[in-house]
UniProtKB/Swiss-Prot annotation:
Chain residues that bind L-tyrosine: 42, 179, 183
UniProt xrefs under InterPro entries: aa-tRNA-synth_Ic (IPR002305), Rossmann-like_a/b/a_fold (IPR014729), S4_RNA-bd_sf (IPR036986), Tyr-tRNA-ligase (IPR002307), Tyr-tRNA-ligase_bac-type (IPR024088), Tyr-tRNA-ligase_bac_1 (IPR024107)
Protein name per Swiss-Prot or TrEMBL: Tyrosine--tRNA ligase
Reactions that this protein is recorded to catalyse: tRNA(Tyr) + L-tyrosine + ATP = L-tyrosyl-tRNA(Tyr) + AMP + diphosphate + H(+)
One GO term of the biological process aspect: tyrosyl-tRNA aminoacylation
Any GO MF annotation of the entry: ATP binding
Alphabetized PANTHER family for the sequence: TYROSINE--TRNA LIGASE, MITOCHONDRIAL, TYROSYL-TRNA SYNTHETASE
Renumbered ranges of motif 'HIGH' region: 47-56
Pfam families per UniProt: tRNA-synt_1b
PROSITE patterns assigned: S4
Keywords carried by this UniProt record: Aminoacyl-tRNA synthetase, ATP-binding, Cytoplasm, Ligase, Nucleotide-binding, Protein biosynthesis, RNA-binding
Gene it is expressed from: tyrS
EC number: 6.1.1.1
């Protein structure tokens, strides 16, 4: 399959048209495998945080498209590899997590996937596995003899994840050095257990994935394939999935639905078309129409992107509520009940009212009262859409009971509420 010949399989055609495809070890062979049906592919997710964030969405969407085009997705939880730590893209060693932390993170991450793929026992139903099941059962000497002998240290030292650390005189532990061996073994084990033929991942995983293909060949498995997606950045070059306030989590408990909706609504104009292709299932002709909008009209495309992307993660009803909240807040100027809220107890509020500096700090809109003072001097803080000019102002308990909307700039809002009873 050359660049001039479109893929014959629905799976690779969709990945190509929508911008998911970066590298593939054997495009023609994989295309034929996908076209014939029954393609089984996996992506691994280490348990380094309590949930996944937007930076993982490209990989999750690839699993979703695989299932929608007749393939079987495997979600591999890295219960074992998380204990080792992936050095890819890292300047220093990852923090070593306890087994309890890894297990807690794994449970949080698991919840994300049922929103994107269907799990079950059917031919195309998704499967979830955990590499701790086989990695923790390995005997060290046996692993060295049976598996380790197939790895070339010369080649391992040439991998970007290793080479960059060494060139910068940054420490790379023996533990991390073994990560690619574990990931390669995962691929072979998943092929042996489930007939998995393809490993997908971000472009930073190319070396590790290809190492798995090579290990499989040396250990006598059938043909295996690698496919990676491009490193996702915004049009201005910022890393996807992070904002000034932190990660854009896919878990409502870690990031309110409204904030998630706002993240997509606030994307750059140049990113709208690309994000619609990657993070929604809108038809390409509709995306082309939205992408062509100019000036103020592009904001309508951003609202559609925000609602569709939010519906994918949090459901259609929650996405529509977030869109309605934004409309009321920004276009109608009313206090929307579904804004992110901070609930205060009556005993937290002095008799004379809550100081404005403390209120913004409690709301999490500023990190300190001194930052609140600076924002007031710059005209950046508002109470119920009115600019705050007096740093000694207070919000009465009655105002909080009615719902006091605090705003930082034009796009960050929190509603202060009084606890019931």
């Amino acid at each position: 399959m050359s660049k001039d010949i479109p893929p014959a399989s629905d799976f690779l055609a969709i990945l190509t048209e929508r911008g998911f495809l970066h590298q593939c070890s054997d495009p023609a062979g994989l295309d034929e495998k996908a076209k014939s049906g029954g393609l089984i592919a996996y992506i691994g997710f280490d348990c380094t945080a309590p949930s996944l964030h937007v930076g993982s969405l490209v990989q999750i969407m690839m699993l979703r498209w695989l299932q929608k085009t007749g393939g079987k997705p495997i979600v591999l939880m890295g219960g074992g590899t998380t204990r080792v730590g992936d050095p890819s893209g890292k300047d220093e060693s990852r923090k070593i997590l306890t087994l309890e932390e890894i297990e807690a993170n794994k449970q949080g991450i698991k919840q994300v996937f049922s929103k994107f793929v269907h799990f079950g026992e059917g031919k195309t139903d998704a499967l979830m596995a955990d590499n701790a099941e086989w990695l923790t059962a390995l005997h060290y000497i046996d692993f060295l003899r049976d598996v380790g002998r197939h790895f070339s240290v010369n080649r391992m030292l040439s991998m970007d994840s290793v080479k960059l650390r060494l060139e910068r005189d940054q420490e790379l532990s023996f533990l991390e050095f073994n990560y690619m061996c574990c990931q390669a073994y995962d691929f072979v084990e998943l092929h042996k257990r489930y007939g998995c033929q393809l490993q997908m991942g971000g472009s930073d995983q190319w070396g590790n994935i290809v190492t798995g293909i090579d290990l499989g060949r040396r250990m006598g498995t059938a043909q295996l394939y690698a496919l990676t997606s491009p490193l996702l950045t915004t049009a201005s070059g910022a890393k996807m999935g992070k904002t000034a306030k932190g990660a854009v989590w896919l878990d409502e408990a870690m990031l309110p639905v409204f904030d998630y909706w706002q993240f997509w609504r606030n994307c750059e104009d140049r990113d709208v078309g690309r994000f619609l292709k990657l993070f929604t299932e809108l038809p390409l002709d509709e995306i082309a129409r939205l992408e062509a909008l100019q000036d103020a009209e592009i904001n309508e495309a951003k609202k559609i992107l925000a609602t569709e992307a939010t519906a994918m993660v949090h459901g259609r009803e929650a996405a529509e509520r977030a869109a309605d909240t934004a409309r009321q807040t920004f276009e109608e100027g009313v206090v929307a009940a579904s804004l992110p809220s901070v609930i205060l107890q009556t005993n937290e509020i002095p008799a004379e009212g809550l100081g404005i500096l403390a209120a913004f700090a409690k709301a999490g809109l500023v990190n300190s009262t001194s930052e609140a003072r600076r924002q007031i001097k710059g005209g950046g803080l508002r109470l119920n859409d009115q600019p705050i000019t007096d740093e000694k102002a207070v919000i009465t308990i009655e105002a909080i009971e009615a719902g006091a909307k605090l705003s930082l700039g034009r796009k960050k809002h929190v509603l202060l509420r009084l606890a019931d009873g």
